[in-house]
Every structure is written in C-alpha cells, then in structure tokens.
Amino acid sequence: MTFRELNLRIFRREPVKRVLWQPRIEHWYNVNKAEGTLPERYAGMSLLEVFDDLGCSVRPYWAFNDAQRYEDSESVRHEEVVEGPLSTVTTHTPAGKLVTVHEHTSVARHTRKYPVETPDDVRVMEWILEHRRAWFDVETYENACKTIGDRAAPCIFIPRINIMRIMIEYMGFENGTTALYLYPKEMEHLIAVINEADDGMLRMVADSPIEIVNYGDNVHQALCAPPIFTRYVMPEYIRRNEILHRAGKKTYPHWDGDCGQLLPYARDCGFDGIEAITPIPQGDVTLEQVRDALGDVILLDGIPCTDFLPAEPIESLIENTRKCIEYFQPHLVLGISDEISPVGDIERVRLVSEICAGAVV
C-alpha cells in the first residue's frame, strides 16, 4: 500500500495496518538550504528526495495550495515600496486604501503594521472581500499530482477562519481584540462579511477533486479564548464542515497554539481530525488529555517538536512516538507538532520512520 492510499484510507476510516508517518520538514530544509547548512548527506537533494531518503510521507500543502486562485477586482491596485528590510504595500480600492508594512530577514518575514486599524479600514477590507472571486486551477492541481505521486494524498489548506484571520492577517492581536470591544457593530459586520465572502471559496473547494481539506487557522486560545471561539468560530466551523462534508471532503483545523481550554469543544465542531495540537513542554496539554478529548477524531501530528532538538534525550522521542501510536492509531496521521526546527536533528525523523515500520497495529 502506498503512502497516498494509506493517507486516504485513514480519512475514509477504512482498515489500515500501518502507521502513516508524515512529518513537516519543509521549514528545516528551506532554512538550511538558504543558509548553506544542510547536512552533507542532503546537500545535493531536493526536498522530496530528502523525504524519500528518510522513508516518510509528505504533507503536500505547498504543492497543491496554488491550485486555489483568489482574484481581487480589477479596480484593486497594489503598490509596493521597499526600503532596506521594510516593504510597504499600499492597496488602493474605490472604497479607500490600506497600508501594510513587513520587515524581512533572509529567511523570515514579520508584520510591522497591519492593514486594518480603524472602522474606515474595516469598510475598505469588506469592499475587497465582497469583490474577490475564487476559482480552481486544474492544471496546477494535475502538475502537483505528478510532483507528489504516491507520497501522499492531495490536500490543501484554505484561508483562516474569521477571528484568526482578523488576529493574524488583518489587525493583529492587540488592535483586533480592542476593536471587538470598542467597535462591536463594525467588527460583527466584518466577521459576517468574511463568512459570506468565504462561500465562494467553499464552493470552489467543494467542486474540486481534492478530498482532504485543512483549515489553516493557527488557533491559539490566547488569540481566540473560549467565549470568542464559541460565539464566532465554532458556528462557522460547523457551517463550513456541513458544506464540505456534503461534497465528500474530509476536514481538520490547524491548532498549533495552546488549546487546553478549547479541547472540550473539539468533538462538537464537526471535524474529521485536528492537526498540530502541541503537547507539553511547548504547548499546554499532555498526550493523555488530547486522547481523552478527541475520542475517535483523527490526530494529525502529536510528537512534540522539542523531541527533535539535538540536546533533548532520545528516549523522550521514542516514548512519545510510541504513546501516539498506542493512543491514537488507527485514527492517526503521525507527525511533528508543529514541525521540526531548522536546528533540529533530521536523523531523528529517520528513527521515527524505523519505529513506524516495526509497529504492530
């Protein structure tokens, strides 16, 4: 059975006799390649060749995501000015303009100024969303299928859910949280516009050939506390899932922050799985808490990324790998919560491959 077939069988809840090991090593590879610090063994390899050498599957968002196409109105114009490490993008629309400032390093980007700061900015963002269209690029999808082959099933992650998009992309945490209390009417309307505008995206995904759909939300309970989660996020999760399930899709969100306060709601959101729940010491939950909260909901990932740091005892990696298999298999796509660090020991990924190959399930 190929990794692709195994991947699909897990989400279709068909019998499986193997553990699917699907770590995300892309950031490790990209940073070390850019810095010239790839280990000698991998220096001449492509990313997929490294995956193959390590004996593991790939979670191929990066290959399939570009099949999602989002186009703004022709009357929207973006103007970029670069000054040293700072790039300033001014978005001009018939409703007004938005300004975003990013600071760049050789391997990363940080937002210095978010585009939405005032109620007037909210209205401009709403205009952009109301005039945006989504379509699926079949040619890109077919090329991605050829690139990935049998290494994994096709999958994508879709734009963040309402609150997480506001907190991470549009306003930032401080301004976004403040605005919810200072401008509740305007923020309620923005959330409603985001939800409605997402319908075009949901129709595009529902009509696409991709079966496995991730909600790339980066949920953290500090950004999305239970009262906010249950009021704005959970109802939209349920609505999205009903639409995509009717189209035969399998869904899961990306919860890579502290989520102990949100786990009690995990089974009520209508997901097939949940990705990237981060155990202690980096997150705030134990694997036992995750097991008890999820029931038969599929866990994607599970092994703390700290276990892949060179200074950490190898015994912890072995123990947590075996716990994940014991607690969650067959409802498991084993991975790293959230991904291996650029300074991680890549040979520990190979060790997990060997454990999975010998696992009796």
Indicate where each model-derived feature is located:
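Active-site loop segments of alpha/beta catalytic cores
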Residues: M1-T37, V101, R123-V361
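Short secondary-structure boundary micro-motifs
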Residues: R4-E5, W62-N65, D72-V76, L86, ...
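Short, solvent-exposed loop/edge-beta patches enriched in aromatic
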Residues: P15, D52-R59, E83-P85, P94-A95
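Segments that shape or occlude catalytic/ligand-binding pockets
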Residues: V31-D72, V76
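Generic hydrophobic, aliphatic-rich segments that mediate packing or membrane embedding
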Residues: L47, E83-S87, T140
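A contiguous, low-structure linker/loop signature
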Residues: S75-H131, R151
